[in-house]
Amino acid sequence: MRVREMQRNWQHLGKWGLLFLGILIICNANATDDLWVTVYYGVPVWKEPTTTLFCASDAKAYDPEVHNVWATYACVPTDPNPQELVLGNVTENFNMWENNMVDQMHLDIISLWDQSLKPCVKSTPLCVTLNCTDVNITMSDINGTSLKEDQGEIKNCSFNVTTELKDKKRKQQALFYRLDVEPIKNSSNIYKLISCNMSTVTQACPKVSFDPIPIHYCAPAGYAILKCNDKRFNGTGPCEKVSTVQCTHGIRPVVSTQLLLNGSLAQEDIIIRSKNITDNTKNIIVQFNRSVIIDCRRPNNNTRKGIRIGPGQTFFATGEIIGDIRKAYCNINRTLWNETLKNVSGEFKKHFNFSVAFNSSSGGDVEITTHSFNCRGEFFYYNTSGLFNETEVANNTNENITLPCRIRQFVNMWQRIGRAMYAPPIEGEIQCTSNITGLLLTRDGSKDIDGKEILRPIGGDMRDNWRSELYKYKVVRIEPVGVAPTKAKRRVVQRAKRAVGMGAVLFGFLGAAGSTMGAAAITLTAQARQLLSGIVQQQSNLLKAIEAQQHLLQLTVWGIKQLQARILAVERYLKDQQLLGIWGCSGKLICTTNVRWNSSWSNKSYDDIWDNMTWMQWEKEIDNYTKTIYSLIEDAQNQQERNEQELLALDKWDSLWSWFSITNWLWYIKIFIMIVGGLIGLRIVFAVLSVVNRVRQGYSPLSLQTLIPNPRGPDRPGGIEEEGGEPDRDRSMRLVSGFLPLTWDDLRSLCSFSYRHLRDLLLIAARTVDRGVKGGWEALKYLWNLTQHWGRELKNSAISLFDTIAIAVAEGTDRIIEVLQRAGRAVLHIPRRIRQGAERFLL
């Protein structure tokens, strides 16, 4: 009976166990739909920063030209294998008018000019009275008067200067251009240098020349330069053809006004760029699709003489002009120039729907009203009215447009107000050929008699010159750490066993920028390898450039910039690694966390995120919540580390081999003694209890090992001789001798005792649970029946209420109808009553 009862109980218990197991499985299945924050390292994500760029060039250390000298110390060697990686399915916004690269280049070229003039002589001591006369020009006209120098354009001046001895004076003679001197008190012969009213005038070194070389701007490691390859890109707005480069193309920092020289050309049609074409205060940058050659010459064969103006100072001036004195001039092919202007006008008509007319500059400083540039160390200023005056251009039929030039030796510094530079005369004839690749224009805001918008050349702000080359670039900061929701949850905090190797190139890193998040996550290893090796490669080049400056015993401004770029790259990498370490993700490309994803951060579905979005789109989606997510990951990691510390404090079973350590033997001996002592004590307790039990029954113990039969009942005869009977299971007791058998017997008795009581306890618990479940089920059934009963009662009550209301309404309606009928009948019977009354009255 007991066995059957146990079977029935276990059957019920098994049913309920299966029920609970099914519920648990369902709950776990639902739990798998939860999303958890996962950290990814090496994702193709970038943001727009402000950072320090460095330059690269093929400068020649032996060349005294100022750009070569500057680039030798300021720039690293160019990459012989420049790489460019096209980013498919990427659209990026560019803005050439708000580009930090332009400001950096502007400061760099200012630094170049300042550094080039640092070791040269200040000409302030030459601010003396000049007694000047006009140089006699006897040259006959050539082809009219185009090449004949104007009378009075060159002055022959004499003046007194201080010799090596400060108390001694010496009279000197030199030639100056009319633009470099000004009369004193309207005198016809007494002059002074035009620069004497300026604070500082620095003379360029006599062996220095200005011939710009291509300079490449490069991004430090951890940053990238994005390039727009759209051939019709106007410099502002989204660009769909984006690539990434390490450095820009070679940019020649040509300082010029009105015309852009030796720049890059548009690949298809002429491109017109302006911050706001309808605003006449905004300059217009025109980029040609075909260059126009301009050939400039100074035919005068000048000589140079040195004038001592004090101890250790020499002022270089023009001594004499050998041969004919002729004007400096520039030649431009008339047909090609007219065709270019016609195409520019057509572009304005095509894209902005208005016709334009060109005219000469409206006035201002000579640097703005003329096209100024540096040719082999001489500063040329030539009048461009012959280029932009349509009437003059149309009436002239010569093959070339010849523009007369004027030369200045005292030049206002374009980089800052109140400073000037004296350019020493260059000996011999000078010739330089350049390519006109663009224009700087401005709108008058008014129209001519034909209703055309008037465009005039302009210049002065060299940032526009740099914008014409940097319009298609922007610098971005790579953000390799990204977070996204996944279905994987971190279960335990595991210590990283090894670090993941980092190394590759920037282009592999951003190669998956246009891919979906799911596709990009597969290539994380290749992307992450870039970060460290890219840093090492760039820092090696920077270090070589810095080492080249060690003999100077001090770093230049650019040397400091190189150090900044080097340190910045390492700091960026270490910052990312520190962040991963705080999150417990060191050395991992994909790191799960136990932070539950909050749908308020993004309500997009899991499939929509991983199958349809790029990492850039996803980063913009959660940008406002990034700090919150980072904080939650850090808090969760701190909690896990505390849990791990507590767990490790209790964990003494790190390795099975530690069990055999000699340091644990003492513990083993203690445990063995405790077990043996416990068994002996247990044996003593059972023996004492047995003796006490038998003494109470009237027996005296002869020995602890003597078999003492248990008393038999009167209904069970003893099994002696032939008498039968069922032997009692407690009738005999096994006699054991020895320590180990005795120990084993006691241990077996203890286990049997424990098993019986635990079995009874489990049966009691099972019965209790079964009864409780049955009682709960009966209670639920009772509640369900009670609910159904009261539901039926409520339904019947409601129906009865509705019936009563309907009857009352019907009866009331009948009464109202009856009253109305009676009233109607009374009204209808009025004539009858009148007639009956009349009849009675007449009768």
UniProtKB/Swiss-Prot annotation:
Post-translational modification: Highly glycosylated by host. The high number of glycan on the protein is reffered to as 'glycan shield' because it contributes to hide protein sequence from adaptive immune system.
Chain span(s) of sequence motif Di-leucine internalization motif: 842-843
Region (Disordered): 709-731
InterPro entries with a match to the protein in the record: Gp120_core_sf (IPR036377), Gp160 (IPR037527), GP41-like (IPR000328), HIV1_Gp120 (IPR000777)
Membrane-traversing stretches: 672-692
Region (V3): 296-329
Alphabetical UniProt keywords: AIDS, Apoptosis, Clathrin-mediated endocytosis of virus by host, Cleavage on pair of basic residues, Coiled coil, Disulfide bond, Fusion of virus membrane with host endosomal membrane, Fusion of virus membrane with host membrane, Glycoprotein, Host cell membrane, Host endosome, Host membrane, Host-virus interaction, Lipoprotein, Membrane, Palmitate, Signal, Transmembrane, Transmembrane helix, Viral attachment to host cell, Viral envelope protein, Viral immunoevasion, Viral penetration into host cytoplasm, Virion, Virus endocytosis by host, Virus entry into host cell
Motif (YXXL motif): 699-702
Region annotation V1: where it falls in the sequence: 132-156
V5 as annotated region, ranges: 448-458, 450-458
Annotated signal sequence range: 1-33
UniProt-annotated site: Cleavage, residues: 498-499
Chain residue ranges for the region called MPER: 649-670
Cytoplasmic side: 693-843
Domain notes: Some of the most genetically diverse regions of the viral genome are present in Env. They are called variable regions 1 through 5 (V1 through V5). Coreceptor usage of gp120 is determined mainly by the primary structure of the third variable region (V3) in the outer domain of gp120. The sequence of V3 determines which coreceptor, CCR5 and/or CXCR4 (corresponding to R5/macrophage, X4/T cell and R5X4/T cell and macrophage tropism), is used to trigger the fusion potential of the Env complex, and hence which cells the virus can infect. Binding to CCR5 involves a region adjacent in addition to V3. The membrane proximal external region (MPER) present in gp41 is a tryptophan-rich region recognized by the antibodies 2F5, Z13, and 4E10. MPER seems to play a role in fusion.
Protein name: Envelope glycoprotein gp160
Organism expressing this protein natively: Human immunodeficiency virus type 1 group M subtype F2 (isolate MP255) (HIV-1)
